């Protein structure tokens, strides 16, 4: 047995499923998950000594690559002054200034510890601000594991085949209206059925939890218009897309102005950080200035803030997003060409530093129904064969891939060459 197999066997006796987040268990692809010893740049190294070109990037945060010296040094320096104080710090102020400068639609920001906390808190705030209970989300989109959001959810919930999680009371779920991504008619129908009851729409501007599904040109502006028409707030969940699709996020890339924005992943540089913010009048409704309660023992802790501040300063440097786009475009084009040479039907979506691989005869993948029609069994075989080639992709047909600026063009070309060999045998 390999060391990963031994560790996984021991872990399953102590941790549910042997992992602390379901998708890591390789449930979506089968087999034994890799246990990682270390990571550096674009590479992961497992406990058995094998190296992999990494396109998971800790599920998105590692846009600069693993073990970036600026982030590592910032964490070490902050840790020497103490780990957590439960009191305000200067770094919290500096971090808030930087985030609101980089994302101009955020007049104010509140730091939390995860993307789930950010979306959960933003929805509570929207409900409190509007005095309404119902929310709209989209089929296949995932916004964390808060009860009201595990309704027709994406990400690990799709991988497990459970879009509706047990343990979510029907009384909670009844306030969540689920519409079809990229289908404005379904959203208008929901508003017309409940014209005075919907507090907000929450949307991934690029649906990255049913793999990678970009919005159609009219979709996000249409959501903005419907929110304005019916008096609801628009929450853009940029936990995955923030600072990755563009410096100011997908909202800037697609030219749409939300009322609230949720952030995570890159904002922490690898540490557990989330944030939500937006219009000043809405944020003023949040405690302690307003009646909507939200709190967190470790929110804004100095280690996480130092990591996030260092990361965002690096991400804001000229050329970062151009490099991400160039590398991702080359990978997407190369995978398409290699699949076509082998006669394998493949769609590769990509936006900025995100991409998605779909085995399908369809010409495009634009919604949940398109994703569910893809050949998951073929993806499973592709995943394991690429793993044997030293390429680590997301272990699920329903998860996006992530590029970093630490990837070289040689890494990309080696990945395409590996895919060409795999497609020939697939």
UniProtKB/Swiss-Prot annotation:
It is an enzyme of class 5 (isomerase). One of its GO terms (molecular function) is pyridoxal phosphate binding. Its EC number is 5.4.3.8. CDD domains: OAT_like (cd00610). GO terms for biological process: protoporphyrinogen IX biosynthetic process. It holds the Pfam family Aminotran_3. It is found in: Cytoplasm. Homodimer. This is Glutamate-1-semialdehyde 2,1-aminomutase. It comes from Escherichia coli O7:K1 (strain IAI39 / ExPEC).
